[in-house]
Amino acid sequence: MTAARASTIKASRRHRLFYRMPHYADPYIHWSLIILAFYGLLMITSASMGLAIGQPGYLAFVIAKQAVFLIAGYFSMTYLANRFSLNFLKSQDFPKLAVGMVFALLACLAFPEVNGAKAWIRVPVSSLDISIQPSEFTKTLVPLVIAAYCGDVSRHYEKGRDLWGRPFLFVMLFAFIIFILQSDFGSMAVVLSIAIVCFLIPQNPAMRKFQRVLGVLTLVGVAGIIYLLTPAGIQLVEMLPIADYQKNRFISAFNPFADQYDTGYQLINGLISFASGGWRGLGFGNS
């Protein structure tokens, strides 16, 4: 058997076994993901037991629904991991993927808002209403976009802007759509946090000035958030031209007891759970 034939057979087997991660995958990250996924399923089951009282079949439906999403997500991850190639990041097709994500984010604007945010695409399947949040995929795409441009150390750049300019524009466009058009402040904050970390990692000399500026702006931003959680900061938040539900998130974070039956309800119940359950909790199904 020729080496080329053996290589083809090996590649074919690897593609068929899409439920396995490639050999170069980090096993610690892989198993951590599996453990956290099943732990999350157990926590959802535990939290749903109280709602299942008087509703036959409700708990089984919740478990089955979450299990389907978990399995589908895992197989999708392994499928893409086995077919991922660094050459794809350097190809002409990768920017098309980033542009496609922009259109996916814009498509959310055609659907009804949920809790003040237009961040979901709703797909009715039989009696189910499946929702897809493109901003969650953006959190995975942002590191790839930055790696595609800032990870190119084989070329010499006279200007740092030639290195980080395009990924920075993509990140800003994602953030603008998510925050301004979708009104999803939480997702925007996560996307920007991921982008900042990814921009600070490369050691290319052409990026040092940009990284210093970004580091200073990050410290200023953190200080600003801390200030907004002070009495003077809350007064400033109340004057900002943002939606009331966004203001209430800052207010409830500062003092959840200000509206304990609405915006502060979840925070207060979290405090109660810590106080009543301690470090070990109250047991499975008692939350």
Indicate where each model-derived feature is located:
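Hydrophobic alpha-helical segments of polytopic membrane proteins
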Residues: 94-99, 161-177, 185-239
